[in-house]
Amino acid sequence: MNIGYASKTLGLPEGRMRSLAMRNASDERLAEAIGANLSALEAVIRYCGANGIRLFRVGSDVIPFGSSPANRLDWAHAFGERLAAIGALAARNQVRLSMHPGQYTVLNSPDDDVVRRAVADLAYHAAFLDALGTGAEAKVVLHVGGAYGDKEAALERFVARCRELDASVRRRLVAENDDRLFTAEDALAASEACGIPMVLDVLHHRLNRGPGGRDGLELLDAAARTWGPQDGPQKVHYAQQAPGRRPGSHADTIGLDGFLAFAASLEGRAPDVMLEVKDKNVSALKCLNALDAHGTTAMLERAWAAYKYSVLEHGQAAYQQVRNLLKDKAAYPVREFYRLVDGALARPAPPGSARNAAQHVWGYVSGAASARERASFARLMERYEGGQADLVAVKRHLARLAGRYGQEYLLHSYYFDL
C-alpha cells in the first residue's frame, strides 16, 4: 500500500512554500516566489523519496495566483527546464503527484462567471502537472460542487461541463464524494458519465452514505473500475473524524487502531491512500511504520528523534516511558510506541513540562548565543512563567536561534510544528 499526504511537511523548513499578497504580485516578486516554491517542492520530493512516501499532493499556491489575471508571468516558459527537472526528480523517487483545487473551484455552479473561473483554475492545475512532464496518473481532484436547490440538475451540469473541458484537463480530472451533498454513488455516477476516475473519500462516505449506498468494499471495487491503465493505481482518501468538532473535520493525527482496521478491511486490495490529516507527513510515517512487517527498533528511534521534545513538552512520564520502551533492540513495539506518543501529545502541555522542554532545546544553541541573545531568552522565559508571553512566542524565538546557528537536528524535529 502506497501512502501520502497533502501540501505541508512538518519538520522540514526547507519545504515551506512562500505566499504573496496580490498587491505585491509584480513579475519580479512572482518569479522570486515561484523560484522559492519550486525549491521547496524539490526538498519535499526528496524527503518523500527518502522516507518511502509515494504520494504527495502539491498545494495550489505553488504558482501564486496561477489562474488569476494578477499573474501575468509566463511561468511555464520561464521555469520550463526547472519544472521538467522536478518532474524527473519525482519519477526517480517514485513519488506520485496530485493537486486538489479549493472550495471556490465549482464547475457545476449556475453562475457563469464562477464556472469561467473554475475552468481557468482547472486548466492551471493541469498545466502545472503538464509542465512537470507527469503522465495521466498525476491527478487533479475535484468535488462535484453545490446542489443549488436541485441536486439532480446540479449533477447534470457537472457532467456536461466536465465533457466540455479541454482534453488536457479532462485526462487528469478525478471526481470525489463529499461529506454533505454528493454521495459516493453520486460521484461514481458522475465519473462514469464523464469518463473520468472516481476517488472514494472514506470519511465522507461514512458521514454521507445516502439511501441505498453500497458498503465500503463493493463501492471501492466499483470505483476501481473507473481507473484505466493510463490513470495509475486507484486512489482513495482516508481521514478520521476529529473528536468534538463538526462532522467531516479531519483529526489532528491518524489513530493507528482505526487505520490498521481500515487496512485489514481492504482484504488484500492495495489502492494508493492519501491521508487527509492535520499533522501531514507525521501520520504518513506513522502508518508506514505500522504496516512494515520487517520494522526495527532503529526505525522507531529515528521517529523518536523527531518527536521527543514535543513529547517532553507534554510530560516527563511519557517521555521516560518511550525511552524505556526502546531499550529492547530486538523488539518492534510500533503500536505501543505510537500509543504513548499520541497519548502524550493529546494532553495539554503543563507549563512546567513546556518550560523543561524549552530549556532542553535552548541547550542546543546556548553555547553559540551572544550575551544579548542569552539575556533576551532569559527575559522571555520570565515573561512566559509570569503569564505575559505564551509558548508560541517561546518556540518561535527558539526556532529563529536554531536557524541562525544551524541546528539541523532541531529544525528537522517536530518541536516547532506540533
Task: Show the residue positions of the predicted features.
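Short, structured loop/turn "capping" segments at alpha-beta junctions
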Residues: 136-137, 198-200, 232
